[in-house]
Design a protein with these regions (language model features):
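Charged, solvent-exposed alpha-helical segments that act as regulatory interaction surfaces
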Residues: 49, 108-109
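Bacterial N-terminal signal peptides
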Residues: 7-16
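Positively charged n-region of N-terminal signal peptides that target proteins for export
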Residues: 1-4
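Electrostatic cytochrome c docking/interface patches
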Residues: 16-35, 110
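Extracytoplasmic electron-transfer domains, predominantly the class I c-type cytochrome c fold
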Residues: 58-108
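Sequence/structural segment immediately N-terminal to covalent heme-attachment motifs in c-type
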Residues: 26-49, 62, 70-77
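Short cysteine/histidine-rich zinc-coordinating motifs and their immediately flanking basic loops
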Residues: 52-57
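Short amphipathic alpha-helical "recognition" segments used for binding
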Residues: 6-7, 35
Length: 110
């Protein structure tokens, strides 16, 4: 095999393994959905339509046009001086990223 071909295969495997590592395991995904529905829902509304905290629906997020990285940082680090707590003790940054992806595409019911 040619070195360029082998390099391409290796690069593809590395990218695939990084993508797989950032996706939580199916059981953890269920835990994260429950966490968002119950814990985040206590401020953002049980249907994420808003309450003490702003709405987290697809429409609301599009309207506010907040960069994804900012949403992840808010989940992980909270917002000092507001009721939004940091969640870094309960989830990783990659899990927060997964949550934001789900919010942007429409959060699952279960």
């Amino acid at each position: 095999m040619k070195p360029v071909f082998l390099s391409s295969i290796f690069a593809s495997l590395v990218v695939a393994s990084i993508a797989a590592a950032s996706e939580p395991a199916p059981e953890r995904q269920k835990e994260l959905v429950r966490m968002v529905r119950q814990d985040c829902g206590s401020c953002h509304g049980m249907t994420l339509n808003g309450g003490l905290g702003p709405a987290l629906t697809v429409e609301a997020l599009k309207e506010r046009d907040i960069p994804k990285e900012s949403l992840v940082a808010t989940i992980v680090g909270g917002r000092p001086g507001t009721p939004m707590p940091p969640w870094h003790r309960f989830l990783s940054e990659s899990e927060a990223d997964w949550i934001v992806d789900r919010l942007i595409e429409g959060f699952p019911q279960q």
